[in-house]
């Protein structure tokens, strides 16, 4: 799942980090999976896994405020379900915290 998130978000050309950002860019994205569970059981085997993903988009200039919509739309286009967002502010950066849900269906054998 981590690789899928990276593959999708890298296309934006914005610095990307898992859990913690150590760079010095004026805008960057941090992501993490805050919950993961098996789902849709049949014959004692799960048919899918559900991932709960947090995306934090940080930016210094308010001219970038709409980029969070690009992030949201891109993830939705790639099968992620948007589950809410809130505004952030920390250490001179503005931010947008976004939650997504992704259901990964296991392939039939």
Predicted regions and their residues:
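Compositionally biased, intrinsically disordered low-complexity segments enriched in polar/Pro/Gly
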Residues: 4, 25, 42-47, 88-90, ...
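Short, surface-exposed linear patches
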Residues: 22, 38-40, 51-55, 75-81, ...
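Oligomerization/assembly interface segments of phage tail-like spikes and tubes
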Residues: 49-61, 94-104
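Short intrinsically disordered coil segments
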Residues: 45-50, 71-73
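Acidic-leaning, charged glycine-interspersed low-complexity segments
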Residues: 69-109
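Small/polar-rich, solvent-exposed N-terminal microdomains that initiate assembly or binding
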Residues: 1-41, 60
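Short amphipathic alpha-helices in soluble, non-transmembrane regions
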Residues: 5-10, 67-75
């Amino acid at each position: 799942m981590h690789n899928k998130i990276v593959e999708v978000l890298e296309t934006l050309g914005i610095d990307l980090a898992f859990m913690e950002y150590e760079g010095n860019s004026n805008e960057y994205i941090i992501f993490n999976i805050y919950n993961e569970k098996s789902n849709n059981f049949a014959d004692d085997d799960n048919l899918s896994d559900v991932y709960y993903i947090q995306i934090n988009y940080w930016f210094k200039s308010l001219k970038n405020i709409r980029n969070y919509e690009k992030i949201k739309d891109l993830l939705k286009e790639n099968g992620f379900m948007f589950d809410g967002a809130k505004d952030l502010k920390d250490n001179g950066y503005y931010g947008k915290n976004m939650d997504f849900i992704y259901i990964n269906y296991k392939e039939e054998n």
